[in-house]
Each structure stands twice: as C-alpha cells, then as structure tokens.
C-alpha cells in the first residue's frame, strides 16, 4: 500500500469528514478545534477554513441532498447551516438550537425536507428544514434509523414519533460463545450507514452497523428481527397501541442468521476492538463495498454484496477484500466517487489521510 496523502490544516484531532458526490475531489473535514477545512484533491493546499465551533469541537457534517452548496455543521448542542457556494467563503443561513445536550450525529433525508440531530441524552430532534422549525422529538429509545449505547438499533415511524422495530445486539445467543470480543466488549452501536437510493434499488433496504464488540452487522431493516416471546410481542387488544417489534440479532458470521442478516467479525478477518465508523463505497460499482474503521487502528474493506446476491455462506476471509493498518485509532471515514484518492480517513491525529482503494 502506498503512503497516504496527508491533508493539513487542523490544530486538534480530526472528528469527521464528508466528500462531495457532484464535485469529485472536494472534501470537508472537521476537528476538535471547531473548524471545518475544505480541500480540493486536485490542488495542493486547502481551499479555505471555516471557524464554526465557537471553541467547541465539530461533531458532525452533512451536505443538503440535491444541493451541495449547503452544508450542515453540528457543534455543542447547535446545528448551523451554511452556504458554501462561493467556494472560498461561507455564509451562515440558519441556526438550530433545539437539542439540550451535545449533538453527536446529524443527517438529512433524501428529499432534503428533514434533518435529524441525535444528542448524548438519547433524544433525536427532527427539524423541518424547509420551514426552519422543530418538527418532532424521538425520545426514550433512540431518524428513522438510530443506534445508541443501549446496544439497540431502532427503526422509527417518525410521523407518529414511536419505534416501529427494534434490534437488540446486546442479547447474546448460544452461537456467540466462541466470540470473546463480543463477551468482553458491549455491542454498543457506534455508527450507522445506509446506502444511497440507487444502491437500495439493487437490494432490500439495509443498514450497516458499527458495533462496540468489533462486529460490523449488515441488517435488512424491513425484515422482522428474531421474535422474543414475551407479553409485549403478543397481538395487541383492539383499541390498544401496538408495541414495536423487538428481537435479538444473532452474530453467527458464517451463515448470517435466519433473517438473512450478515455479521462480519474477527473470525472473518475483522476488527479486534470496537468499530467506530462505517460507510458504503461511492467509487466504482457504488455501494459494492462496506468500509469500516476501528479502535484497533484498522480499516477493513468488505464485499458485502455477494452475501445478499448469491447467499454465500463461505467461511474464512471471503468477504474481506483488504485491510489497512494505521498508526492511530479511526474516528471517521468517507469515500469519494473517483478511481484514486477515494478513501478519506480521520484518525485521532490532526492530519487527515487519503488512500486509494481498488
């Protein structure tokens, strides 16, 4: 593997990054210094820097789908919306101060009508970004799809403000006893990724989950999890509210589980410590690969699609395409739609690394 390209500009540990899909090579990185640095990989130096954190680290970034001249930035308990059309400057358009605790992740829906901001209290604020007002709060669980330190993945009906389906990765079954990483480290949900709409058309709706026990799970979000026989799973009486479907997620990576989910763990060449981030590839055959980064200072490239297309149940490292060894823990990563310099990695240093995959 060639030495990565190094992007400099931050004064503290980098926290997250995003890559433009409409302008290949343009990326934005954020850090604990409260700044967002913009780079064009066709150029040598960074384009410009936005100081947006007011002394607070920047926790998350996202473009407005369909209009990458608009970017959303979270810092502290605030989300700011900027116009970056000028390329070398930015203009503050809106500020949203609905979260009571520190925001750790933001995301827009594909229609650019809502923005979700998940904070440390467990609340998810759904913001109507067309009318610039608060729409709804998702609470006491975890939009749409959320994960948390309760080891649960929740699919929401956010129009009603309540969970629709819950996957509990903390519920172990007998198939997991050989996985010591799972036993020693809780299966906290550290990060989620969903493929873009044109990738979803090829498969069922899926979600990649970065777990604290070192496993990367690929879940069919429209299938019911393994049923847990309890009173809550009984058929509701007439006139009563229906309870969300709750179940455990088996972590048998050799065959997935009866729901057709895939679990990529250490036995398949995966991570030996918590997985901190996960994303779907945007280069080449879009969505073909899942790329994960972890506290083991490793980046893994997985060909997950063969499992869902052919139903392969091979053992060994058939799903693992490549592995990168880094010098620091991985905080975040993203990909660009180019054939080279297509993997951007933010680690615990202040320097962003850019690799070529494929």
Q: Which residues does each PLM region occupy?
A:
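Loop/turn-rich, solvent-exposed surfaces of beta-rich toroidal or solenoidal domains
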Residues: 198-224, 252, 259-262, 266-309
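Loop/turn segments within WD40 beta-propeller blades
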Residues: 18-24, 61-68, 106-113, 118, ...
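A short helix->beta-strand "capping" segment at the edge of beta-propeller domains
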Residues: 1-11, 43-45, 257-266, 314-321
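Short loop/turn segments immediately following beta-strands, especially the blade-tip
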Residues: 83-88, 158-164, 220-256, 303-312, ...
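WD40-repeat beta-propellers
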Residues: 36-40, 79-85, 124-128, 153-157, ...
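Blade-level signature of beta-propeller repeat domains, shared across WD40, Kelch, NHL, RCC1
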Residues: 332-358
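Conserved strand-to-loop turn within each blade of WD40 beta-propeller repeats
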Residues: 30-33, 73-77, 111, 118-121, ...
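WD40/WD-repeat beta-propeller blade N-cap
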Residues: 7-14, 51-58, 64-65, 96-103, ...
């Amino acid at each position: 593997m060639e030495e990565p390209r190094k992007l400099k500009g931050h004064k503290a540990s980098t926290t997250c990054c995003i890559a433009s899909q409409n302008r290949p090579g343009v990326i934005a990185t954020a850090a604990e210094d409260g700044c967002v640095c913009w780079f064009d990989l066709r150029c040598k130096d960074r384009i410009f820097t936005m100081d947006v954190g007011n002394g607070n680290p920047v926790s998350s970034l996202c473009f407005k789908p369909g209009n990458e001249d608009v970017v959303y930035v979270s810092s502290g308990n605030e989300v700011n919306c900027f116009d970056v059309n000028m390329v070398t400057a930015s203009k503050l358009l809106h500020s949203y101060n609905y979260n009571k605790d520190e925001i750790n992740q933001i995301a827009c829906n594909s229609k650019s009508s809502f923005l979700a901001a998940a904070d440390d209290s467990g609340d998810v604020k759904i913001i109507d970004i067309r009318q610039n007002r608060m729409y709804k709060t998702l609470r006491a669980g975890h939009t749409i799809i959320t994960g948390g330190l309760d080891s649960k993945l929740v699919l929401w009906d956010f129009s009603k403000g309540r969970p629709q389906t819950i996957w509990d990765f903390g519920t172990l079954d007998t198939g997991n006893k050989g996985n010591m990483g799972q036993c020693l480290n809780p299966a906290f949900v550290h990060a989620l990724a969903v493929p873009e709409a044109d990738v979803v058309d090829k498969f069922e709706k899926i979600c990649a989950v970065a777990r604290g026990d070192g496993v990367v799970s690929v879940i069919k979000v429209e299938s019911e999890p393994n049923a847990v026989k309890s009173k809550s799973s009984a058929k509701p009486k007439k006139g009563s509210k229906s309870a969300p479907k709750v179940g455990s997620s088996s972590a048998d990576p050799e065959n997935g589980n009866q729901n057709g989910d895939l679990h990529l763990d250490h036995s398949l060449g995966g991570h030996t410590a918590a997985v901190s981030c996960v994303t779907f590839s945007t280069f080449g055959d879009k969505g073909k690969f899942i790329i994960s980064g972890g506290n083991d200072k490793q980046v893994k490239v997985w060909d997950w699609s063969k499992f869902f297309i052919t139903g392969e149940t091979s053992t060994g490292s058939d799903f693992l395409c490549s592995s990168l060894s880094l010098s620091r823990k991985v905080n975040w990563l993203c990909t660009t739609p180019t054939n080279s310099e297509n993997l951007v990695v933010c680690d615990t240093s202040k320097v962003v690394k850019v690799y070529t995959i494929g």
